[in-house]
């Protein structure tokens, strides 16, 4: 893998890990990037009570994912680590046969196998599917679209804290969070859910408190020409002072 492709894959892992952290919050208490295993097949791992509860591999391609590749990746991922749940995060487009294979696995779990599914699963041991769950997440290859998906997930997260942030503010927090996840992969220790939430909430409240516009209500009262002692009836606000140094449109 070349330098450009490696950097892009590293970035995609950051996006995928943030999405996992934001959308799968009810299960994990620790998230790992580049989780160490004997065959290095686990890109992201979710942990709970010192056990891996979800093992994730992230793949990306500018071309298309084939069924044969997906079968190999699943076998290797399952063989590399024992977990109750596995996930292939595919960033890019899938061939028709790959989509059929993905749907066939879902039919296997739902006990709704038909002739198409049986044919698609031929050559792949369904014993690998028993007593565990295999999921697929398919995301677009375009970084701009991934950024939007992360922003939307973060927006939903922020809404639970009753904060109102602008598009630019959410984008800033999203980028910083992805960057944090990428840096954490170099440490190998993982990130506690408590710390993840605390750091994210700290950013949210800091941005909301320091950089959110504040609305101030101003009441305007009119008086007839020649009225005196206005100060007894209201408090006068000098707009000249407020707009000092600013250019106003002619006629105002």
Predicted regions span which residues?
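Acidic metal-coordinating catalytic centers involved in nucleic-acid phosphodiester chemistry
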Residues: 1-6, 60-252
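Catalytic centers of nucleases
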Residues: 6-7, 11-75
């Amino acid at each position: 893998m070349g330098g450009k492709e490696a950097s892009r894959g590293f970035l995609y892992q950051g996006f995928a890990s943030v999405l996992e952290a934001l959308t799968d919050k009810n299960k994990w208490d620790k998230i790992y990037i580049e989780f160490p295993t004997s065959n290095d097949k686990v890109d992201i791992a979710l942990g709970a009570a010192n056990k891996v509860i979800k093992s994730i591999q992230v793949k990306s391609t500018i071309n298309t994912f084939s069924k044969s590749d997906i079968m190999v990746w699943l076998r290797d991922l399952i063989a590399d680590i024992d977990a109750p749940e596995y996930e292939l995060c595919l960033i890019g487009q899938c061939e028709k046969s790959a989509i059929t294979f993905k749907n066939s696995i879902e039919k296997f779990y739902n006990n709704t196998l038909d002739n198409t599914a049986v044919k698609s699963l031929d050559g792949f041991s369904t014993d690998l599917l028993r007593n565990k769950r295999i999921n697929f997440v398919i995301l677009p290859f375009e970084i701009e679209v991934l950024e939007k998906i992360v922003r939307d997930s973060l927006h939903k997260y922020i809404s639970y804290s009753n904060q109102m942030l602008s598009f630019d503010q959410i984008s800033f927090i999203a980028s910083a969070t992805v960057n944090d996840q990428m840096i954490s992969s170099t440490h190998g220790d993982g990130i506690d859910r408590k710390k993840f939430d605390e750091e994210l909430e700290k950013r949210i409240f800091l941005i909301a408190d320091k950089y959110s516009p504040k609305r101030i209500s101003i009441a305007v009262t009119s008086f007839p020409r020649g009225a005196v002692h206005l100060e007894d009836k209201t408090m006068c606000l000098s707009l000249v002072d407020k707009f000092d140094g600013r250019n106003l449109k002619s006629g105002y």
